[in-house]
């Protein structure tokens, strides 16, 4: 099931985030039999899932798995709720990444986005985890998202092709990003190292809307 995309004109002042208490059942709709298991962790990091709909005793949450945009319903008693005041919007047409806090814009960065052959998929996603970079070229950290490449299924024998937000990789790509952004990646979103560093406090579960 896919939830409606975030209306970029109405960036929410906050988003509720559900932390699973271990692996829990997921449901196609409230009151129906369970049809899946929501993992308690994702690549070793706790599952922190943004809430997109609420009914009495039930929550609809986004999932980090393929297909892109997947959601499921969970019982409210199976999760612990917190709140993130942040939201990220990545505009592929302007090649910029914008960060909002409590509904107000706080950052706007030029970004490297996917090329026409390996585009950055549009849709409504979330930040799943902040992980150490595979090398210093990726910046101080990588923000992994729930977005997955549509053109690549196995990036460098990793078993998947998850869209990340990270540094520019090379000085040449850094120069291409410049002040306006550029289509230079295999789908990931690249930022200047100094801009990426400003995102260190963005928590897992923060919604990310990628628009064209």
Specify the residue positions occupied by each region the protein language model found.
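A mature extracytoplasmic/lumenal domain signature
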Residues: 30, 55, 63-67, 78, ...
